[in-house]
Amino acid sequence: MSPASLSPALSPLALCCALLLSGCGDGAGTGPTSNGAVRTLTLGAYTTPREAYGKAIIPAFQRHWREKTGEEVRFEESYLGSGAQARAIVGGFEADVAALSLEADVEAIARAGLIQRDWRAGPHRGMVTRSIVVIAVRPGNPKGIHDWDDLGRPGLDVLTPNVRTSGGAMWNVCALYGAALRGGTSAPKGDAAAAETLLGAVLKNVRIMDKGARESIVNFEKGVGDAAITYENEVLVARQSGQDSEYVVPRSTILIENPVAVIDANAEKHGNRDLADAFVAFLASPQAQRAFTDYGLRPVDETVAAEVRDRFPAVQDLFSIRDLGGWPEAIRILFAPGGVYERVVASLNAQP
């Protein structure tokens, strides 16, 4: 059952419970070993890397752990929009590991006292994958969409998720607004008012705001909309499933960096902190990093990045969230009450 198919009246915690999947990977993780040891690890993740975890990463870790310790590992997996997943964990969903879209969502869990160690202390400051924000278009690009400004043309139908539930949606807004501030659109460089105007023009064309990036791209694959603002890897995964998917890389776009963290309070309660730590460490290994690239995600490991460089198009002006002052500043300017996003939406709602 996908999140989109659930009743909207369900709370994030109820959603997580409904979406828990027993992830057995290669099928060997369900029975006891010769010494009878079977352990369980619960992963709470955002929607985008579902295939990467379920089909590649988790089975590989199960084999790794079995060879190292003789123990079988059974995974329970929950996939929601990043913000919804973070709120579910804070609200009582006992994930041992959180793999989310943005560090602000991990920080929300830390502020609730559930993460007690410095989750950024590991390799790559706690980041496990990268991507970029791109524009998915119809085969042959019949609408002639080439950059951010094109998404604001009257008459277009655009898809992007809801920023209240989706980390991907927040990345999308940061990409468009940041590109405008940097002179990567028709807006004059450094002109915040013009950047806000462009964001409004694009949001005016948004037809559907789904709960997560995965639901958004699935609707696009079903024929809804002319374009979708999305993670690059979502389009690449769609191609793997047989979709005739194309995308445009804006000349200026943001580098997406996705964090992972052990939820200390839950792992301690479940007696599996060693297992959770080992899984997070495994995600940084060359084996796992290569597996992520097989599902369209860009690696954080520089050696692996060099190996797969030809798979991913270059970006003329690639910036990071740090260029917007970091997540606390981006949230204050863009997503806090009275911020850019709220002002734009209020203005659009006030239009006849």
Ranges and model annotations:
Residues 20-23:
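C-terminal motif of bacterial Sec signal peptides marking the signal peptidase cleavage site
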Residues 183-250:
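Ligand-binding pocket segment of bilobal, Venus flytrap-like solute-binding proteins
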Residues 127-132, 196-203, 210, 241-273, ...:
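Periplasmic-binding protein-like
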Residues 45, 49-57, 85, 94, ...:
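Stable alpha-helical elements in mature extracytoplasmic
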Residues 26-166, 349-350:
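N-terminal segment of the mature folded domain
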Residues 44-47, 137-138, 157-191, 202-206, ...:
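Short beta-strand->loop
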Residues 267-352:
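Extracellular/periplasmic juxtamembrane helices and adjacent flexible linkers that interface
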Residues 1-13:
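Bacterial N-terminal signal peptides that target proteins for export
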